[in-house]
From Swiss-Prot:
Quaternary structure annotation from Swiss-Prot or TrEMBL: Monomer.
Matching SUPFAM superfamilies: S-adenosyl-L-methionine-dependent methyltransferases
Domain of life: Bacteria
Pfam families, A to Z: FtsJ, RlmM_FDX
Residues annotated as catalytic: 301 (proton acceptor)
Keyword Cell membrane annotated: no
Enzyme Commission number: 2.1.1.186
Coiled coil: none
Residues reported in the UniProt entry to bind S-adenosyl-L-methionine: 217-220, 236, 256, 272
Compartment(s) where it occurs, according to its Swiss-Prot or TrEMBL record: Cytoplasm
Protein name: Ribosomal RNA large subunit methyltransferase M
Job description of the protein: Catalyzes the 2'-O-methylation at nucleotide C2498 in 23S rRNA.
Length: 350
């Protein structure tokens, strides 16, 4: 049996390392099969029942590099063009009939690549026919998953309904606001969607809150804060978009982001400074030790090598300082869809 996990193309090694660690924490051991640039990793495990237990126990929102995932019996090759459904249906029955009686629905996934996107129409077509052949029950805790790699190869599998990303495949469906000064604005919006439940936006992202944006220019992240009717100190030596400055909600502080300290604690700190991740993590920890914010969203620009280990080091760096300070907190990281060679962190002080 295999755990198939999708990721950003180029981060297969990081995903493989994360899967090894996460499954081992839950007493499941196996080995990853990963190839650079394919956009997914197969984690092979001997005991299928244990793997199903594991995917049901791991908290999906705590994973960093996993965009989406499911359990499968392995890729099926040689799917005939005149009947792709039967081999997929047969493997589903053989692999899961002893563990899962029904699924609530069948999801259609594609690898986030040009080749994967080109298969989306075929996946929907095959999936619509396959769905009618599967044992469906709306009350089931499991979902079926179909992922085609080509016209003749693909996966059929299952995943728990409650261990899912907000968007299928982890591909955030957000519309770029024309008024925003840069496309980086979508990173902060996606971060809020990922880290903050929709039911809590009105209280945790409330009008008249005070915020600081470090590395603000030209104002992509500041725009999101202003759109939530917050008052923002935009900290950057570079110029801000003039339209952002017209409404009176933004104060431009032309100083270095690492040197700035707020005169009073604020509700939100956001930071998209391009610097060494350890330096950014150190700054976030300092702000947290001083209780200068309630919540923070920040980006860590990752090095070319040992990127997974760098995330772990930065997490430990922040956590050790918070534990020493006796602070109650929640810290999470995620490589969002709109992230590139980076991950986004969220720190909530309690």
């Amino acid at each position: 049996m295999e755990l198939v996990a999708l990721c950003r193309t180029g981060f297969e090694k990081e995903l493989a390392a994360e899967l090894v660690d996460v499954t081992a924490t839950h007493g499941v051991h196996g080995y990853p099969k990963a190839r650079d640039g394919q956009g997914y990793v197969q984690f092979v495990v001997d005991d299928g029942a244990e793997l199903l237990r594991c995917i049901n126990a791991v908290v999906f929102d705590e994973l960093v590099f996993v965009r989406d995932w499911f359990v499968s019996a392995g890729a099926i090759s040689g799917l005939p063009a005149d009947d792709r459904v039967s081999p997929l249906q047969n493997q589903f029955k053989a692999a899961f009939s002893g563990h899962i009686q029904e699924v609530a629905d069948l999801l259609f996934l594609n690898v986030d690549s040009n080749e994967g996107k080109a298969l989306s129409k075929l996946t929907r077509g095959v999936g619509s026919h396959l769905k009618r052949q599967l044992p469906l029950a709306k009350g089931s805790d499991w979902l079926g998953v179909l992922l085609l790699l080509s016209g003749s190869e693909g996966f059929i599998g299952v995943c728990p309904r409650r261990q899912r990303p907000r968007w299928a495949g982890g591909v955030a469906r957000l519309k770029f606001p024309r008024e925003a000064p840069s496309r980086a604005t979508l990173k902060l919006e996606e971060a809020w969607h990922h880290f903050i439940p929709a039911s809590e936006w009105d209280t945790r992202l409330a009008p008249s809150m005070k915020a600081v944006d470090l590395g603000a220019a030209p104002g992509g992240w500041t725009w999101q804060l202003v759109a939530r009717s917050m008052f923002v100190d935009a900290v950057d030596n570079g110029p801000m978009a003039p339209t952002l400055m017209e409404g009176g909600q933004v104060t431009h502080r032309q100083v270095d982001g690492f040197a700035y300290h707020p005169p009073k604690p604020v509700d939100w700190l956001v930071c998209d400074i391009a610097d060494k991740p350890a330096r950014v993590a150190d700054m976030i920890a300092s702000w947290a030790e001083n209780s200068w914010f309630r919540e923070a969203v920040f980006n860590l620009k990752l090095p070319m090598k040992q990127r997974y280990k760098e995330v772990l080091r930065c997490r430990e760096q922040i956590e050790l300082r918070l534990l020493a300070a006796g602070r109650d907190y929640r810290l999470r990281f995620k490589q969002l869809y709109h992230d590139r060679e980076e991950v986004t962190g969220h720190l909530e002080l309690r």
